[in-house]
Amino acid sequence: MKDLLKLLKPTNQAEEFDGIRIALSSPDMIRSWSYGEVKKPETINYRTFKPERDGLFCARIFGPVKDYECLCGKYKRLKHRGVICEKCGVEVTLTKVRRERMGHIELASPVAHIWFLKSLPSRIGLMLDMTLRDIERVLYFESYVVTEGGLTSLEQGQILTEDEYLDALEEHGDEFDAKMGAEAVLDLLRAVDIDGDVQKLREELPETNSETKRKKISKRLKLLEAFQVSNNKPEWMILKVLPILPPDLRPLVPLDGGRFATSDLNDLYRRVINRNNRLKRLLDLAAPDIIVRNEKRMLQEAVDALLDNGRRGRAITGSNKRPLKSLADMIKGKQGRFRQNLLGKRVDYSGRSVITVGPKLRLHQCGLPKKMALELFKPFIYGKLERRGLATTIKAAKKMVERETAEVWDVLDEVIKEHPVLLNRAPTLHRLGIQAFEPVLIEGKAIQLHPLVCAAYNADFDGDQMAVHLPLTLEAQLEARALMMSTNNVLSPASGDPIIVPSQDVVLGLYYMTKEKINGKGEGMVFKDPNEAEKAYRTGQVELHSRVRVRITDTTIDDDGNRTTKTELRDTTCGRAILSLIMPEGLPFELINQAMGKKPIGRMLNKAYRDLGLKDTVVFADQIMYTGFHYAMVSGASVGINDMVIPEAKKEIVSAAEEEVAEIQEQFESGLVTAGEKYNKVIDIWSTANEKVSKAMMDNLSKEIVKNKDGEDEEQASFNSVFMMADSGARGSPAQIRQLAGMRGLMAKPDGSIIETPIVANFREGLNVLQYFISTHGARKGLADTALKTANSGYLTRRLVDVSQDVVIMEEDCGTYEGLYMKPLIEGGDVVEPLRERVLGRVLCEPVMKPGSEEELLPRNTLLDEKMCDVLEENSIDEVKVRSVITCDTDFGVCAHCYGRDLARGHMVNQGEAVGVIAAQSIGEPGTQLTMRTFHIGGAASRATAENNIQVKNPGTIKLHNAKWVVNSDKAHVITSRSTELTLTDEYGRERERYKVPYGAVLKKGEGDSVDGGETVANWDPHTHPIITEVEGRIKFVDLIDGVTMTRQTDELTGLSSIVVLETGQRTSAGKDMRPMVKLVDGKGNDVNIAGTDIPAQYFLPGNAIINLEDNSEVKIGDTLARIPQEGSKTRDITGGLPRVADLFEARKPKEPAILAEKTGTVSFGKETKGKRRLLITPTDGGDQHEEMIPKWRQLNVFEGEQVTKGEVIADGPEAPHDILRLRGVSAVANYIVNEVQEVYRLQGVKINDKHIETIVRQMLRKALILRAGDTNLLEGEMVEMSEVLAANAKAEADGKKPAIFERQLLGITKASLSTESFISAASFQETTRVLTEAAVGGKKDSLRGLKENVIVGRLIPAGTGYSYHKERMQRRLDELNVDIEPTMTAEQAEQQLADALNAGNSSAGDDSAE
């Protein structure tokens, strides 16, 4: 019995460990792992296939080849367990030990570990403070290094060439030591005094001034401290003993025909052993130095190749000319251990097949072919057959199943009942790519899928395949049913809108049945209820579309569940009455009393979910689908060539356009317009022509004139099939119909420019050869784009998941009072996103007050649902402060209140929800729909003329924000501030429109004036930038000398002369240092001050400024003194689509970014250099002056003497997110990234909730840079996790010490993933070698907090249902630590016990942890 128990023991090793530590292993440690030294390069005997003794597969070292059998066959059987055979020396045990027993090689000469040498920055190099090149020259025997200087002039670590060494030998004899090779480096590493060096460097750091030196010191300090903390010894970076992988992990398999298939590692090990043995022999023979050296170098190279082939020099190749796969290659990359086997595994109990439509299924069902079911449920069937007594043994059951007897099918039916299966379609881009269904057995071999879940899977039935998985355990079945059932996933986790929305045929059917027709059969009939209407339709008394009156009963259910009914006669159509029969009670008839396109159906389902709950919605969705299919069939909608009606007006429009083009061509030939202007005009003409044709076509298609019952003509919505499909949203769009029946329009050349002659034909008329050829380019580009897009989008998703995977809801409420202010998003005259959309499902951070009173509408910590949003709208509230993940205070995760509503469920989010992964999937999944290209501004795109006025759309009141203005002589306001915004508010004070107003704009209306819709409120000259005077007086020119700093120009047409200031480059040497300016003086010639200050009114003039006034002329307030011409800003390519999203999340700095003011203060210009000017800001609060060099070609927005606030734009351009964070703070950068990302998705019509993007931004803001360390143990210039900084500061403040000063850093997602605390997660993401090297040197411990690390070590993840498991485990650990201590002990004893308990915990972790 004991033996049996022992047998079971090794398999059941407890996985109770709390972390995994990675460290350098010492030679002794490697020897302790080993079961013996491998002395020979032989593998197995080619005749007997038995492993050679002392070879790479030796049974004595690694264990027996057959279970419980020694090699020579003396001991067989279980009874000899643990005996070591005296003849062949093999222990009698399981073969399995050959997977875990390691061997070793004693190296004849030490060898450097290539990872610590070559992985940048070189750890050995940093340790010794030598360059990598020098160390390599020593290691590969090209030069000597001094290991012991003695009393000579030679320094330790000095590099000597062969000749220098010989000279030194002559001079000093044996007073010094110099060696080459790894021994030398080993001696140097041994000599490093870590504690002393750390002390020295810490003292040096504050005293060094040069930036580079400080960086170098802090790098070295970090490394030394890592060694100090981790108890690694530097000399362990040099190998003296090489471990050998267990043989079953590098198998050698005999193939038929006497050949062997082998792992590359065996070849690499053989090289090492061969060279090592040869070196041993040479040393024994006392061979000449040069030969020994060469052999040592070869050994070093062999070990390098084994550890990381190709890292240094050329990769060693095998017989077939491909590089051998080394140990490093085994773990990195997509095919490496991490990503291939640990993060993604193949599973059993699965099958795959093609999918087809299951229009008769319920939403929670799927059709499973009998063959597949039989195979998947085999074990269940065997068990059931035995329990029934139909089969006596498993074998008999197996026979029955193979014969497929009748009982087997009966049993299968029972087994399948209520046992959900999982269906998955690749690529699984979001969590709805795997859902659970109840199987229904079907004939045939294809899986049947419910049409409504196709949208979630992004599946269609053109040959897609899906995989079926079977949840086995009870818990798995329970989770599948409660969490993954398709009926539980009605809402999309990305936007919170229903994702189970009918499309295509169903939409067409519903649209058809709810259309109305004038003068249909039975028009004007009256029915007592919808049932009667249906009877009349079925008996042919009434047409489906006829306008009739029906008595309809509406039921409304309020919050408490009370029902109120209302019955009245309604004007409707027969079809709508029939549709109302399947409406669940509680939904108003209004919802369907219209032509039901895709959008109204979506709204209806959304309302059903919010008002009636999940169950009714699911039943309703199914009913809608069945009805839709039926009436789509009845409608007989089909497409014939005659349905594509070409508008009459097309000929005229096209010929008119051709005439215009001919006219422009004439103008071009006579030299009136340039080629560029001609090109733009021609393209303009054709674009408008195309618009006209398509408008004419749609008008023609969408309406038809019919006779009504009085015989008069009346127009109604058309019943044209093509139009119905597009109008209902079932398939197609006006743009596509335009190509079928309008004209194809302008096409692009391969270089992206637009061809001047459009394709005038459409598909109905047919294309000629040239037209066809032109259009092939676009089509091919589309295909190439799609392929690229898929890969790029997948990679973006992977980076997003990796950065956000450990964001999990950890607690209910972190109690923070921080949050983000939310306003409606307004661009120009349009509300892009109303407040309601932005705050729905968020939690309030501050109570909302009723406008104009002290009354509290909604208290703090309210979750805003639909009803609350109605309250906000009724009280016309414009700005709300809500909680956000970005400002959440929870360490290691976020709290439920800061996240708000779980979008996929519609209630407050649960603890343990993996919101990070959901966010990443929601952003990544639509990635394939985004465009790939950057738009080149050319042709039709650059038609937008420069804006020169603001015309409001709605009536309302004007408000100006951060504006300064003066009133000029015409009583108009002239703006004299930079970043002014003008908003229009309605009568409730809600913002409706928002515009930017430039400096120098003239406002007809001022602050608080009311305007009518369509009124123009501001004008400015878009081509010049004025300089406005804020005081009146006479002007006086200073340093304006004709021919030195300015020239006069006379306009040919008007004869007026103007003064143009020369740029510094064009001036003579005399004028280089002059500063031309205009001063204002009063009648007596004294300087005038700007009102309310003692700053004299003087305006410096930059180069190219134009002055139309003469010296000493009078000016009034608000007059223009000078104008600076604005050259049209360089046409930049607009980056759009996927690359733009990637740029934002990677926080890339744009080319030529906007320059922002670093401080608040007064601007002045210092001495200029050749290509740059010096901008100085003198702070208002009297701090240090800030200076910045700005290239001259940048157009500046500020003049000398102007006030700027911190973060204000000084030179236009795309803003860099890092600058925004530094100068305007966290919420500004969050807003910027959220809005910019949303803009890209909005263009494609994809709806994503803001909080997903915020979750990613939170992860990008995880790190802080330490500016001053204070009294904490942080290093300045170091990047540290925010939570760590806050903890250190809290500790310092509690002890009354100085806290550290830090600044938040914004990291791109790749960099953020690589700098996570967990090295396992980082290593499995990218740059595996670098991450592992760094972690090993620092002796890092991974405490397995995130999801990825736990998947890799094979545990439940700390999210979802695994969250409670981890919580309980933590609690148990705490209890265990608290239980052992009896209060009777002394303090010392207690401490000892606690230490023992902790050590016991650690040592048990040590056994399992991967050292």
UniProtKB/Swiss-Prot annotation:
Residues that coordinate or bind Mg(2+): D460, D462, D464
CDD domains: RNAP_beta'_C, RNAP_beta'_N
Keyword Ribonucleoprotein attributed: no
GO CC field: DNA-directed RNA polymerase complex
Keywords: DNA-directed RNA polymerase, Magnesium, Metal-binding, Nucleotidyltransferase, Transcription, Transferase, Zinc
GO biological process, one term: DNA-templated transcription
Job description of the protein: DNA-dependent RNA polymerase catalyzes the transcription of DNA into RNA using the four ribonucleoside triphosphates as substrates.
Protein name, as recorded: DNA-directed RNA polymerase subunit beta'
Organism whose genome encodes this protein: Idiomarina loihiensis (strain ATCC BAA-735 / DSM 15497 / L2-TR)
Gene assigned in the entry: rpoC
